[in-house]
Amino acid sequence: MQWGHCGVKSASCSWTPSLSSLLVWLILPFSLPYCLGSPSQDGYWSFFSEWFAPRFSVRALPFTLPNYRRSYEGLLPNCRPDVPQFAVKHPLGMFWHMRVSHLIDEMVSRRIYQTMEHSGQAAWKQVVGEATLTKLSGLDIVTHFQHLAAVEADSCRFLSSRLVMLKNLAVGNVSLQYNTTLDRVELIFPTPGTRPKLTDFRQWLISVHASIFSSVASSVTLFIVLWLRIPALRYVFGFHWPTATHHSS
């Protein structure tokens, strides 16, 4: 906040707000209702309660498939294919989508990494075996994130673009139907006997291995090139190569 001198005329006050600060304080009360949401009978604060309450309850519940599926089914009507209109209608909605997308990505990555670690280090050094893939596909979290990927890829393209892990997982055995009469997304879940496809996990693991190998190879190549092209770099690491000296007779 900027302040300026009152001047010589007023001796009672020594500081007064500048014109830019006054404009900010005048515009803020008019823009506050738009940021809080549409008016309702309960007031503007009801927007915060109904928007953030389901999210905190989702995080508090145990990380199981039925709890998260039930929570996200209640939030599906808030999702629309038209992302700009959804962002204008709920200004804080996009901020929550970005935060929860990183949260989900970290959780699923941690669970898959733990499973791979308990399966043995050989799974990372060789081609992934059928037993490891079967163990991964048997987790409830995998089925749940496949369900989320199917929902978000069809109705929440903004959120789906930020879920790197979910895009690599299979979007299988879950069909979506948008009911125009009820204005909501209806889900058709697969039968309990179906299992996720293992080829998608193999492709994801191969892509992870390829990215790690390419990053390491590029780093080593860059170091070798700099080592050969910049002689001063050798002395930084303490290597002094002998040079030929010619003595004149």
Curated annotation (Swiss-Prot):
For this UniProt record, give its keywords in alphabetical order, as a comma-separated list. Glycoprotein, Host endoplasmic reticulum, Host Golgi apparatus, Host membrane, Host-virus interaction, Membrane, Secreted, Signal, Transmembrane, Transmembrane helix, Viral attachment to host cell, Viral envelope protein, Virion, Virus entry into host cell
How does this chain sit within the bilayer? Single-pass type I membrane protein
Name a Pfam family for this protein: PRRSV_Env
Signal sequence extent: 1-35
Q: Which residues are glycosylated?
A: 173, 179
Transmembrane spans? 208-228
Entry's Gene Ontology BP terms: symbiont entry into host cell; virion attachment to host cell
Q: Which ranges make up the Virion surface topological domains here?
A: 36-207
Q: Where in the cell is it found?
A: Virion membrane; Host endoplasmic reticulum membrane; Host Golgi apparatus membrane; Secreted
Its main subcellular localisation, reduced to a broad class, is virion
Example GO CC term: the record gives:
virion membrane
Quaternary structure, from the entry: Heterotrimer of GP2a, GP3, and GP4. The GP2a-GP3-GP4 complex associates with the E protein. Interacts with host CD163; this interaction plays a role in virus entry into host cell.
This one is known as Glycoprotein 2a
Source species: Porcine reproductive and respiratory syndrome virus (strain Lelystad)
